[in-house]
Design a protein with these regions (language model features):
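Mixed-charge, glycine-accented linear interaction segment located at domain edges/termini
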Residues: 523-555
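Catalytic alpha/beta core domains of metabolic enzymes, predominantly
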Residues: 214-217, 224-342
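A mid-to-C-terminal "edge-of-domain" accessory segment
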Residues: 35-39, 45, 284, 290-459, ...
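Alpha/beta enzyme core
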Residues: 51-76, 94-100, 114-235, 253-258
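Generic long, charged, amphipathic alpha-helical segments
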Residues: 486-521
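Active-site beta-loop-alpha junctions enriched in small/polar residues
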Residues: 47, 82-84, 108-114, 140-142, ...
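N-terminal capping/small domains of soluble enzymes
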Residues: 6-7, 11-12, 30-117, 361-370, ...
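Short beta-alpha connecting loops at secondary-structure transitions
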Residues: 210-212, 264-272, 284-296, 356-363, ...
Length: 555
């Protein structure tokens, strides 16, 4: 069947004029005209992102994230599906009370039900009730879904698309049509896929967005199909990709290269299955690498902050290996790499980390060279250069310690102490002369007790403290003993404690070495220290002593 030749009158009824694109005011302000070469960013973190495992937002959370995205300059923020749950209805009510400076809030929904007029479809009416300037609806492109999921005819599916969009345009909404399974549908039946997209365009859709819903399309295929859509459609074309084969961002870039002017995605790549197009990658790729107008460079400098903020609100541990904004995105470990970066930064960096609000990090390990030590020490405020006589000693000591099981990549407090002691710039603030840890109680209740004896100059202190466990008891006893000499320790707290058993496959469980990493804070800063020993108490004590000594060194 030649769907492309079906007359416009068939979609809207005989004698009904095709709706014209509307210049809409009100409902959040004037719609901006699409600038030449502008690629608009459409964020769906609050809807599609929450379909990812472990991702959930309260109404208050959604409003906070939306406001952050608005400040960042995202062009559209999809708030949710008002027909699906009370939470999203409440979000849209609250969003309507706010003034949005840069973004337009979008409500999301589907085409009308089969054999029901759009004006009578409750879900479609709720999209109008949301009072957003933009409505995004999805419809079927793939005949498999039309016949087996919707269980309707190809003709009725096209009518559902056209009728819904026409109704929304009549109600003065900007309409973005998400062509679900657009790429798989086109590969299955190009003629029918194009007919659905043209139906959306003729009904007045401002955008037809090609969705790689299953996330399995290759960039070359995306490029080819996007180019065809651009040739066949006069409205704007967008792209919505999923990351099932790790190509969501690459596919979005391919679409933009072929003329797509809207990219949909989520912050940090949240989304169903393996996630959506990660906007923290796509945005700098489009703006900085491709040189396209999108989010301004001044705002992209806040991208790392935006990424961390959304993770924090979602209560998700940040992905340190995330491109551009991750903690290791600009981290250098290999000695030859660091030596080159020390001379010419871009010799091993694709971009200046500050353009996205990130920073360069130099890691120190058994792979380190002299340049690693120098740059890391300078980063920590220690005066040192390649000609410092003690540099060889420091490097040897680091490699020996790493061989014993120490890991200084995440324990910069202990590393700073090692370097300063090797340089002769640290004098012991105290000496631990003795300690004892014991546990008493029965099967139902027990108490850990730690006793320590410390010397500061010619004075000694001998204290006892109870704790929830041996490490907590030691921490309390040490700070109690030293507080009289160093009041600054009053604010120091142990905030995290991690244990890793080393070389357990080559030794019995009791003989294996234990590495302890401690996070401490004084309510202003955080620092990390490490200890290694076959005895977990000894390893913990090393890390605790380094933690206290590092804080006193800062004083």
């Amino acid at each position: 069947m030649n769907y492309s030749t079906w007359p416009s009158a068939w979609f809207f009824g005989a004698g009904v004029a095709r709706p014209q694109a509307l210049e809409i005011t009100g409902l959040g302000g004037n719609f901006r005209p699409l600038m030449k070469n502008l690629v608009e960013i459409y964020d769906t973190t609050l809807r599609d992102g929450t379909q990812g495992e472990g991702v959930s937002f309260s109404v208050a959370d959604k409003l906070r994230v939306a406001e952050k995205l608005d400040a960042f300059g995202v062009h559209y923020v999809e708030g949710g599906w008002p027909g699906s749950n009370p939470k999203d209805i409440e979000f849209f009510k609250e969003a309507a009370k706010r003034k949005w400076r840069n973004t337009q809030i979008a409500a999301f929904g589907s085409t009308r039900r089969k054999k029901v007029a759009a004006k009578d479809d409750q879900q479609v009416k709720l999209l109008i009730d949301a009072e957003t300037p933009v409505v995004t609806i999805f419809g079927k492109t793939w005949l498999l879904h039309v016949r087996e999921v919707l269980r309707t005819t190809p003709k009725e599916n096209i009518a559902m698309i056209a009728d819904t969009i026409a109704f929304l345009k009549k109600n003065k909404r900007k309409v973005i049509y998400d062509a679900e399974h657009a790429l798989d549908g086109y590969k299955d039946d190009p003629e029918y896929a194009l007919a659905t997209w043209k139906a959306a365009e003729e009904a007045g859709a401002d955008f037809v967005v090609l969705c790689d819903t299953n996330g399995g399309t290759l960039p070359s295929e995306v490029a080819e199909i996007t180019a065809i859509a651009k040739k066949e459609l006069s409205c704007q074309v967008g792209i919505h990709t999923h990351n099932d084969i790790g190509l969501a961002v690459a596919n979005a870039v391919s679409a933009v290269e072929q003329g797509a002017t809207q990219v949909q995605g989520t912050i940090n790549g949240y989304g169903e299955r393996t996630g959506n197009c990660n906007l923290t990658c796509a945005i700098p790729n489009i703006s900085l690498k491709m040189g396209r107008r999108s989010i301004t460079k001044s705002r992209i400098k806040k991208l790392s902050d935006l990424s961390r903020f959304v993770d924090e609100v979602a209560n998700i541990i940040p992905n340190r290996r995330q491109p551009w904004v991750g903690g290791t995105a600009f981290a250098h470990k290999g000695g030859m790499h660091v030596n080159a970066v020390q001379k010419v930064a871009h010799s091993f960096e694709h971009a200046d980390p500050t353009v996205v609000g990130n920073k360069r990090r130099i890691l120190v390990s058994d792979l380190a060279g002299r340049s690693n030590i120098v740059m890391k020490a300078q980063e920590m405020g220690i005066r040192i250069n390649n000609d410092t006589p003690e540099l060889k000693t420091i490097l040897t000591k680091v490699k020996e310690q790493e061989h014993l099981g120490y890991d200084y990549e995440g324990a910069e407090g202990s590393l700073a102490l090692l370097i300063r002691k090797s340089l002769g710039r640290v004098y012991p603030a105290f000496d631990l002369e003795a300690y004892h840890v014991s546990m008493r109680g029965d099967a139902l209740e027990h108490v850990c007790e730690a006793t320590v004896k410390v010397r500061v100059g010619d004075k000694t202190a001998h204290t006892v403290a109870d704790g929830d466990g041996p490490v907590n008891a030691l921490d309390q006893a040490l700070r109690n003993a030293l507080r009289g000499f160093y009041p600054v320790l009053e604010m120091v707290r142990l905030t995290d404690y991690k244990v890793r058993i080393l070389n357990s496959s080559r030794a019995s469980g009791t003989a294996a070495k234990t590495r302890v990493l401690i996070e401490s804070t004084d309510c202003k800063e955080r620092w990390y220290t490490v200890g290694v020993n076959e005895n977990i108490i000894e390893a913990s004590l090393q890390a605790l002593l380094d933690s206290i000594e590092f804080r006193l060194l800062k004083k």
